[in-house]
Structure formats: C-alpha cells, structure tokens
Amino acid sequence: MIQGSYRDTWTEVSLDAIHHNVTAFKNHIDHHTKLMAVVKADGYGHGAVEVAQEALTAGADYLAVAILDEAIQLRDAGIDAPLLVLGYTHPDGLKTAIEQQITLTVFTKEDAEQVKIAAELLQKTARIHLKIESGMNRIGIATKEEAVEIAKALHSSFVMLEGAFTHFADADNTDPTYTEMQFHRFNQIISHLRTHCHIPIVHCCNTAATIAYPDMHLDMVRVGIGIYGLYPETHLKELIDLKQAMSLKTKPVYIKTVDQDTAISYGLTFTTERKSTIATMPIGYADGFSRLLSNRGDVIVHAGRAPIVGRICMDQSMIDVTDVENVGLDDVITIFGEPTEGYIAMEEVANLMGTIHYETACLIGKRVPRIYMRQSEAVNYKGLVEKEPVTS
C-alpha cells in the first residue's frame, strides 16, 4: 500500500532527474544566458511547486507558467523567483499580478494601456514581456510598428519593460528553414524596437531550439519538456543527456486463470487464445491511462513485458501475465519509466496513443499520487489524501 493513498497506483517523480536535467541545460548554454524553467500545466503533470523548487536549486534563473492562476499557486507556496505568465491575463487579474510581482505578457495596445492604468493606480511596478509573432500564428505582435506603439503605450515610471520573446513552431524539425525564418523575423522586430526603448531580456528558444540552435540562445532560453527528461524529437538525444523524471506504477488487485476463448472487458474486443493468467490493475482512463492503449500497449512486470488486454476501463484495466512467472499481488507493475532502467519510455506510450509525450505526462490525473524521490527514497508526497510519503 502507498501510504498517503488507499490504492496501489502512483507516480514517482525523481527530483534527482529534474536536477540532472536542469544542470545539463545550464552546461549546454553560455554562462551569460539565463535559463527559464517552464512549469505550466502543473509542471507538465509532475507537480509545479516541487519541480520549480528543484529547478531553482539546480540553477534555473526564471520560471514560467501559462496562466495567472498557476503563477499565484507558486507565490502561495513561497516561491519568490522571477515568474512569467506566458499567455493572456485578463484585466481582472492585473492587480494581483502586480502586487505579487508576477511578470505579464502583453501583445495588444489595449492590454498595454490596462497594465499601465493598473500599475499607476497601485503605485507599484508592473513587469512586462512583449510577445512577438514570428510564425507560430497564435498570439503576438506582428509588426515592428505595432511593437513600438505598444511599448510607447506602456511608458510609465510604474511599468518595467523587462523583455520580449517569440515562440518557434518547428524547432524540432531537422530542416531548420522555418526556424531560421522565424529567428530572422524576430530579430528584425527586436532591432527596431531597441532603437526606441531598452529591453534587457530577449528570448526565443524552447527546448528543441535550446538543444539544436546555440546561436539563437540570446539572453535567455525557455526549457519546458526537457526539464522533465523528455526529448521533443528523437534526433536531439545525441546532443544532450536527459533522464526521464516520471514513472507510473501500480500493483495488481486480482489475478485469475481463465480458459481459452474467454472475453476480457467491455465490448469483448479481446478473447484469449489459450489458457491465460489475467491480472487486474487499479488504474484506468480516468487516471490518464488512456483507453487508446487498449489491446495495444505493454507494461513491465518482473523485468518482462506483459500486454494490455481488453478495453481499458475508467478505473481498472487488465494485463496478460501468462508468460511472466510468479506474479503476485505485491508485485510492482511499471507502465512507463526511465528507459535506461529497463522500463518503457513515455515516448513509446505516446506513440501508441497517436500523440506526444507532453500530453501523456499531463494526462495523469489528480487522484494518482505523486511521490517525490531523491536517491531512491521518498521525500515528499502529493495526493488527494495527505499522509506520510512512504512506500512499501
């Protein structure tokens, strides 16, 4: 039983791996370049507070999240490091952001004017980064003239225009053409903007670009997926050594032997072709163990693979352990983990789902406890029920 949960299903997050990955990126960039650790989406499912704390300990200079709510969560946890909200912030949130020294992204003149008004009313400094559109075509300032206009709209003794950034759409592609075009377009706007105002921090590199394009690192790089030990694309693995931080584990709750031609689970999509040993696991698609893995994926038991059989249910799922000797109720089943330790990589699971491992990590639900490990020992725990972080 996992102490802190009444169900033997959990994730382990290696803080050593997080630390290793941040250090690897710090060593990969010039010592003058800052490292921004992206911990949005609850740290890509790993736990934003815990990852942020470890990343800062390992040398990260700045943090980033997607929305103001995530930033407030970090501030409430006592994290006072520089912190950027990468996306849009509603005017209703400006007062809170300014008071908590949360840096905001601005990409329209209207937003700039709202920020200026809020800061001057509070008589407190608003920290701002401009978002530049260079080819992602999501949000951002598209022209150099518009960039200057917005910068002027922000002009106030209570507004600090701290930075400007863009986001690459195709940096994980082996063909650099589009990324180079974006970089050139971004630099054109920044060069023009800097003739009108001072911008201390300019940044454009995501994880893929940080690994593959050292000439684009500029003042700061933004590393998200790489901090968690996951590569944007396979070809980048030879350029930096990362360790997958998250593993997903469970234990069987029931093991039985069934005859040949026995149907398993909803829809009768799997029928045994021989007398088989079937183990039921207390994990299902409500936990992020996707139904798309039904009859497709494998898990690791006793260092061997066992196939997932039948449709994955909301709370339970079944595996065929016929070819794995002596499986018992106390045996740990690993759904994914660090591949160098003999486990199935999250990337493989994502490929079977027809998606990317970014999504696979984020899908792991809140009712699956996160156990934080250091040197193979549990040091912290986060789950629906707060208890001591002890495994057995």
From Swiss-Prot:
Protein's recorded name: Alanine racemase 2
Membrane spanning stretches: none
Family statement drawn from the similarity comment of this UniProt entry: Belongs to the alanine racemase family.
Organism per entry: Oceanobacillus iheyensis (strain DSM 14371 / CIP 107618 / JCM 11309 / KCTC 3954 / HTE831)
Gene Ontology molecular functions: alanine racemase activity; pyridoxal phosphate binding
Gene Ontology CC entries for this record: cytosol
Modified residues (N6-(pyridoxal phosphate)lysine): 40
A Pfam family that the UniProt record links to this protein: Ala_racemase_C
Keyword Isomerase applies: yes
Protein's job: Catalyzes the interconversion of L-alanine and D-alanine. May also act on other amino acids.
Source taxonomy: Bacteria, Bacillati, Bacillota, Bacilli, Bacillales
Catalytic residues in the record: 40, 266
Keywords on record: Isomerase, Pyridoxal phosphate
